[in-house]
Amino acid sequence: MELKVLNIQGAETGEVVTLNDEIFAVEVSEHAMYLDVKAILANRRQGTHKAKTRAEVRGGGKKPFRQKGTGNARQGSTRSGLMVGGGAIFGPQPRTYDQKVNRKVKQLARRSALSAKAAAGQIVVVDDFSFEAIKTRPVADMLKNLGLAEKKTLLMMPHHDNVVSTSGRNIEKLNVMVADQASTYDILNSQVVLFQKGALQKIEETLG
C-alpha cells in the first residue's frame, strides 16, 4: 500500500511511502487483538479492593442474647454477615488481575490492528517535523490542517520529543507516543493513526 506524505500545513510533499505488507496488510486476527486488549486493560487494574470479614470488623465479641427462650434466631455475634454492621461474606479481597500474553500473539495483535486501520483508510503520514517551543497552538493547527482536529488521533513519533509530547498533552483527542511503545489498545482506541514519516521505520524495526 502506498500513501502520500503530507506536511504540517496539510499539503502534499510529492513524496510517497510504501507501507510494509507484513505489518499493514496481514490477515486481521480479531482473537489475537481481543486477547491483547483484554490483558492490557486487566493489567491496569490495581486490585486493591478489600472488604472486611467478620473476623476483621470492630465489635461483636459478646453474644447478643441468650441462646434459647427469646423466640429469635440464635446469634453468637452481632458482626455476622447476616447482621447490619457485620462483616462481608465472600467480599472482595486484594488480588492481581495480571494476564500474560505471548510475545508472538502481541506482535500479531499489533500488526492486525495496524492492518485494520490501513484497510479502513485511517492511516495518515506526515513529514518529520519539530517545534521550537512548548505550545499547544502549533500542534492544534497541524491537526486542523490535516483535517484531524475533531478525530481521536494517535500520533506516532520515531523517538521521544518532549516539545511535541508536552505541547499535545492539552489536546483532549490527541495521544502522542513513540511508535515502538504504542499498544494494540492505543491503536484500536484511535480513529486515525498519524505517523511521522520516520516512525514508519521505527515500527518496521519493532514488528517487521
Curated annotation (Swiss-Prot):
Disulfide bonds: none annotated. GO terms for molecular function: rRNA binding; structural constituent of ribosome. The keyword Kinase does not apply. InterPro entries: Ribosomal_uL4, Ribosomal_uL4-like, Ribosomal_uL4_dom_sf. GO terms for cellular component: ribonucleoprotein complex; ribosome. Residues 49-78 are annotated as: Disordered. Belongs to the universal ribosomal protein uL4 family. One of the primary rRNA binding proteins, this protein initially binds near the 5'-end of the 23S rRNA. It is important during the early stages of 50S assembly. It makes multiple contacts with different domains of the 23S rRNA in the assembled 50S subunit and ribosome. Forms part of the polypeptide exit tunnel. This is Large ribosomal subunit protein uL4. It comes from Chlorobaculum tepidum (strain ATCC 49652 / DSM 12025 / NBRC 103806 / TLS) (Chlorobium tepidum).
